[in-house]
Amino acid sequence: MKFVSLHHHTTHSYLDGFGTPLQHCERAAELGYTALAVTEHGNVSSAFQFEKAANKIGIKPIFGIEAYTAPSAEDPRQTKFHLTILARNQDGYRNLNMLVTRSWKQYYYHPTMTGADVAEFGNGLTILSGCSGSYMACNLVGGKGFAVPETSDDKWAAYEEVGRIAERFANIFDGQFYLEVQAFPELENTRKINAAYAQLSHETGIPLAATMDVHYPRPEDNEMQVVLHGCGPQGKGQATADELLRRWNLRRQTYATRERQDTSKTSNGHRTEKRTGLAGY
């Protein structure tokens, strides 16, 4: 299987990603990638630098975004959930930019789009269900206002609701919706999400897409991301470097673009589509 990284953040993901688009492209080429998707938080400001770098290095650029989404545009203070969106072609790139523009116009602080927005401008786009901060994932494991399912009945109800959401997405985007599984085996919630998505894929036929949610190009860059987190709202009140490292220092070998990309454990033995599930990439 030829792996392509489809969920990638550069320094344009403010106070979260580290490394220039060129550094990420250089690292991708070192690892043998033929293409790379950059999905900044809520913006496409790296697109020009990314395209220029990818062309220089000789890999295919895939333009995307990790969007902030909300159920409606009525309350700008409501909780935001993540959704991974990729442009497949020129129409998709145009619609991606339309979505980003609208998301900045209709919200303050965090540019936010609704499901209706994504559906309206969905032509040429591929949608991944998102990371552990997505609406579907939070339904499954709790977080962002969702209670952690404790009983078997609660867990089953959450699973059924996620199944209904996934099938709606699959119907709207007609073969261009994927369940996103990620390779963080040390994170319990991610293991639970992956297992649920693998089962859901088996039951519904909705394909899986394995991603790495990369935030810096090399393992040794982990400490810089810790510093970036400490500078943001999530670092408020953490006075020492030791405290920042304790909270944010995830295992480096599973939180950076890897020397060896092993996605075989992300889906509990269930098959991900060739080239991470996205034909044409």
Kindly label every feature range from the protein language model.
Residues 1-263, 274, 278-281:
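Phosphodiester-processing cores and adjacent nucleic acid-binding clamps
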Residues 266-272:
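Short, small-residue-biased leader/transition segments that mark boundaries at the very start
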